A protein has these predicted regions:
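Rossmann-like NAD(P)-binding element
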Residues: 48-55, 66-107
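NAD(P)+-binding Rossmann beta1-loop-alpha1 motif at the extreme N-terminus of oxidoreductases
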Residues: 2-63
């Protein structure tokens, strides 16, 4: 795992971070995307469905603004810049340090 210091870690400055692919842009995937991006990680949020990515982009922006309004976050634009939305799985998995699976549970 190749980790680099982004110097923009918004949670704990100076902590090394890396890049992560999150597979699944539903509620849980969006939550993980926010957690990783706020910690300074570069995030690739993947979903097979392009409309799910459109919803994710809007919902993440809304959630970041909500955190700011409650005094629980800052710099939502900077955090959004760390999240890239990807509909190609191979591209999402290229050059990442970690993969977080957040797909639907179909039993």
């Amino acid at each position: 795992m190749n980790k680099t210091d982004t110097s923009q870690n918004l949670v704990e400055p100076g902590i090394s971070s890396g890049s992560v692919a999150i597979v699944g842009a539903g509620l849980i995937g969006r939550g993980w995307a926010i957690v990783f991006a706020r910690a300074g990680w570069k995030v690739k949020l993947y979903d097979l469905h392009v409309d799910a990515l459109d919803v994710a982009k809007k919902e993440i922006a809304n959630q970041l603004q909500m955190l700011v309004s409650h005094g629980l976050g800052s710099q939502p634009d900077l955090i959004m810049q760390k999240i890239h939305f990807e509909s190609d799985l191979a591209a999402a998995l290229t050059d990442v340090d970690y993969v977080q699976e957040c797909g639907p549970e179909v039993l």
